[in-house]
Curated annotation (Swiss-Prot):
Binds 1 FMN per subunit. It comes from Rhizobium johnstonii (strain DSM 114642 / LMG 32736 / 3841). FMN binds at S10, S15, L16, S17. Pfam families: Flavodoxin_2. InterPro entries: Flavodoxin_fold (IPR003680), Flavoprotein-like_sf (IPR029039), FMN-dep_NADH:Q_OxRdtase_AzoR1 (IPR050104), NADH:quinone_OxRdtase_FMN_depd (IPR023048). Transmembrane segments: none annotated. The keyword Chloroplast does not apply. Keywords: Flavoprotein, FMN, NAD, Oxidoreductase. Belongs to the azoreductase type 1 family. This is FMN-dependent NADH:quinone oxidoreductase.
Length: 204
């Protein structure tokens, strides 16, 4: 059974990245009978930030953890299992201060676990979350996929770097950009993103 992990992170009620990502996940599901969508609304249901208790607990084998430490890593363990079980991951975020939403960053902090999603070797770190396809839906008021503002887009390079570190390199970004350039530009950007979603679904 195929698993699609859907991660939405925008806190905005009028978010554009969220409905496009949801539509993509649902279309992929409809194209693959028997598949399931596991959704994490990271804005509506914020994850716990890592703290001293958490960082100490993950450095111990499970059997050596105290009851309090076990509770501290419970959510992280669930998130790691969801990530490893997923065949496809759909991520939505707005470009906030040139990067991803903090809610999505917290998810990353919870799933980047040595021994679970990556490991250290004598020749360097090796990602363990391999064999997955990722789609990133990125919304922004300006244009950051190309042109003079492209160097300010830290979201896509960061996601490619950190997901690559975990062993995930097959990543496509669906830009919904130029939304602040007026209604006509916004409509054009939304239509282009929806068209790409349809193309992806038909090819699935």
């Amino acid at each position: 059974m195929s698993s699609i992990l859907l991660l939405t992170s925008s806190p905005r009620a009028d978010s554009l990245s969220t409905p496009i990502a949801v539509d993509l996940a649902e279309k992929l599901k409809s194209q693959n009978p028997g598949s399931v969508v596991v959704r994490r609304d990271l804005a509506a249901n914020p994850l716990p930030h890592i703290d001293d208790l958490f960082t100490g607990a993950i450095r111990k084998p499970p059997e050596a953890r105290t009851a309090e430490e076990t509770v501290a890593v419970k959510t992280s363990d669930e998130l790691v299992n969801e990530l490893l079980a997923a065949d496809t991951i759909v991520i939505s975020t707005g470009l906030i201060n040139f990067n991803i939403y903090s809610s999505l960053k917290t998810w990353i902090d919870n799933v980047a676990r040595a021994g679970l999603t990556f490991k250290y070797t004598e020749s360097g770190p090796v990602g363990l979350a391999t064999g997955k396809k990722v789609y990133v839906v990125l919304a922004s008021g300006g244009v950051y996929s190309q042109g003079p503002a492209a160097p300010l887009n830290h979201a896509v390079p960061y996601l490619k770097s950190v997901l690559g570190f975990l062993g995930i390199s097959d990543i496509e970004t669906i830009y919904v950009e130029g939304l602040a350039f007026g209604p006509e530009a916004a409509e054009k950007a939304i239509d282009a993103a929806k068209s790409r979603v349809q193309e992806i679904a038909l090819a699935a």
